[in-house]
Amino acid sequence: MKVLWAALLVALLAGCWADVEPEPQLERELEPEAPWQASQPWEQALGRFRDYLRWVQTLSDQVQEEVLNTQVTQELTVLMEETMKEVKAYREELEEQLGPMASETQARVAKELQAAQARLGSDMEDVRNRLAQYRSEVQAMLGQSAEELRARLASHLRKLRKRLLRDAEDLHKRLAVYRAGVREGAERSVSSIRERFWPLVEQARARNANVAAVAAQPLRERAEALGQQLRGRLDEVREQVEEMRVKMEEQADQMRQQAEAFQARLKSWFEPLVQDMQRQWAGLVEKLQAAVGTSPTTAPVEKQ
């Protein structure tokens, strides 16, 4: 999931290049936004990326034109290709982790992962095509309609910030659904086992009642024979119930361990990628600042 978070960041960049109508006037004062609640590493990375986009939008006109002419686009494309490799590796690892689960659950999760990977690959291919198209438009518009170019850039950045926040909240909900699904699956397994062996308990109670009625007869020998039969039946049922209780406990413990391992795997996948993205984005910021030169505009302070 960690890698999918990073892939989501890259895939969302495709939306920032969508065609928009040019605004009549560039808004120099950005609209206020709700504060970003960052408690997890990936949330902090999203917050820094979001603030970075706002900072780029506040740059001067000359600096914006220089930014559009840097090699940021090429480096972003390399980052996309690396992310796709990580997504593929993570998907294979996740499918191995889901091996012990039910076949229909494994098939459903694998299908969702394949669909997500296909959508991500399509989005990244669209990003490359749109980047080439937009770069050509920038070169054609330089010196002709700078105000329109700045307005389009500002609109792209605003749309990207909103998409980041919306998709981050959506992914929060999806994680909650998966966690709820794990708990629901465990409860269904326990309920299924209980339904299978509850009739045995009822049968034992019925036999006990019948034997008790027959034992009231004056024939002692018949009562003893029936008593022995009852004890044998009860011992058999007791052993079956005890065996199933042990199996239920083992299965519940196994499912808890799988859930914990799954969460640990998500954390171990995501944290290194967040650090790698932070380093790469830090490199991009340094290049942007190098292009800015002595510009008075400064980048926003990184959230701790």
UniProtKB/Swiss-Prot annotation:
GO MF annotation, one: cholesterol transfer activity
Lineage: Eukaryota, Metazoa, Chordata, Craniata, Vertebrata
PTM notes: APOE exists as multiple glycosylated and sialylated glycoforms within cells and in plasma. The extent of glycosylation and sialylation are tissue and context specific. Glycated in plasma VLDL.
Region (Specificity for association with VLDL): 265-277
Matches recorded under Pfam families: Apolipoprotein
Gene3D superfamilies listed in its UniProt record: Apolipoprotein
Region: 8 X 22 AA approximate tandem repeats, residue numbers: 78-242
GO biological process, one term: phospholipid efflux
GO cellular component terms listed in the entry, alphabetical order: chylomicron; extracellular exosome; high-density lipoprotein particle; low-density lipoprotein particle; multivesicular body, internal vesicle; very-low-density lipoprotein particle
Principal place of residence: secreted
Signal peptide: 1-18
Sequence repeats: 78-99, 100-121, 122-143, 144-165, 166-187, 188-208, 209-220, 221-242
Record gene name: APOE
Annotated source species: Acinonyx jubatus
InterPro entries linked: ApoA_E, Apolipoprotein_A1/A4/E
Subcellular location: Secreted; Secreted, Extracellular space; Secreted, Extracellular space, Extracellular matrix; Extracellular vesicle
Keywords: Chylomicron, Endosome, Extracellular matrix, HDL, Heparin-binding, Lipid transport, Lipid-binding, Phosphoprotein, Repeat, Secreted, Signal, Transport, VLDL
Record protein name field: Apolipoprotein E
Family statement drawn from the similarity comment of this UniProt entry: Belongs to the apolipoprotein A1/A4/E family.
